[in-house]
Each structure stands twice: as structure tokens, then as C-alpha cells.
């Protein structure tokens, strides 16, 4: 095989490898949702589901908008490993719980917010704000 063809083959193999390795990182971080960390917003609603999974747990709420119409709102939370260190469990939220949670809303206006790190959480009138440990900082 000619040296130039050999170099092209190696370069193509390298590029395919880099793209293949980048896909999982994009899948984890490439949700397409950008959050506005300058506008903490309190969302109040009723829990419909709590998904305790990696890479981030998700909380789903039925929230009434200004007109009284119920809309689903999703909250992206920490990973289960971090949440455990903060004193949370996979049974933290149950369907039907009344929740008030401070989130950073999606910049797009979508009904999605981020509660990664520490955010104020009240469940059925009880403060359930996660504890922050040195390891979480």
C-alpha cells in the first residue's frame, strides 16, 4: 500500500474513533436545553413521576399555569449518586405529593427546569432542601 494511502486510512480510522467516542458525551450533555441561572423560579405542582436514573434524576409535576390549565413540568436533578450523598432517596417524591421547588428555567420557555446543585424543595409543606456536603462542591 502506498504511504499516502496508508496515512489517509489511519486518519480516517482516527476520525471515526473520535466521533464514536464523542457520541456518549453528546448524549449525556447534549440535551439541547439551556437553563437561565440568573432567574431562579419557584414551581409549585403535584408529583406525577420521579425517575431515579443516571445521568440525572427527573421529577415530573402537574403545574397550573396562569389560566388554570394543568401543564406537565419536568425538573432535571442531580445524579442519584450525588442525591444519596445529599441525603435523598429514590422514594423522596411520590405521585400525589405537593411540591414547591426552586429551579433555573429553560431559556427557551419550555416547561423544564434545572435543580442541579442545591435548590429549595418543599414536599407536602415540609422543607426537604438537600444537604450539601463538601464532596458535592
Regions found by a protein language model. Give the residues of each.
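N-terminal signal peptide c-region/cleavage motif recognized by signal peptidases
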Residues: 22-24
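Short boundary/loop segments of OB/S1/cold-shock single-stranded nucleic-acid-binding domains
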Residues: 26-41
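Conserved hydrophobic positions within beta-strands
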Residues: 43-47
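OB-fold/S1-family single-stranded nucleic acid-binding modules
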Residues: 106-135
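Short, structured beta-strand/loop micro-motifs enriched in basic residues and often containing a Trp
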Residues: 77-85
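Short aromatic-glycine-enriched beta-strand elements
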Residues: 53-64
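Bacterial N-terminal signal peptides that target proteins for export
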Residues: 2-15
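Short nucleic-acid-contacting surface segments enriched for D/E, G, S/T with interspersed K/R
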Residues: 85-101
Amino acid at each position: 500500500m502506498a504511504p499516502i494511502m496508508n496515512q489517509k486510512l489511519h486518519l480516517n480510522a482516527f476520525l471515526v474513533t473520535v466521533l464514536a467516542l464523542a457520541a456518549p458525551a453528546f448524549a449525556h450533555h447534549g440535551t439541547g436545553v439551556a437553563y437561565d441561572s440568573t432567574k431562579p423560579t419557584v414551581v409549585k405542582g403535584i408529583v406525577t413521576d420521579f425517575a431515579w436514573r443516571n445521568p440525572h434524576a427527573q421529577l415530573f409535576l402537574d403545574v397550573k399555569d396562569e389560566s388554570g390549565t394543568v401543564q406537565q413540568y419536568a425538573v432535571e436533578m442531580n445524579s442519584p449518586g450525588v442525591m444519596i450523598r445529599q441525603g435523598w432517596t429514590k422514594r423522596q417524591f411520590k405521585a400525589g405529593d405537593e411540591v414547591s421547588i426552586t429551579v433555573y428555567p429553560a431559556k427557551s420557555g419550555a416547561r423544564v427546569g434545572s435543580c442541579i446543585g442545591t435548590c429549595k424543595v418543599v414536599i407536602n409543606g415540609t422543607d426537604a432542601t438537600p444537604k450539601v456536603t463538601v464532596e458535592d462542591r
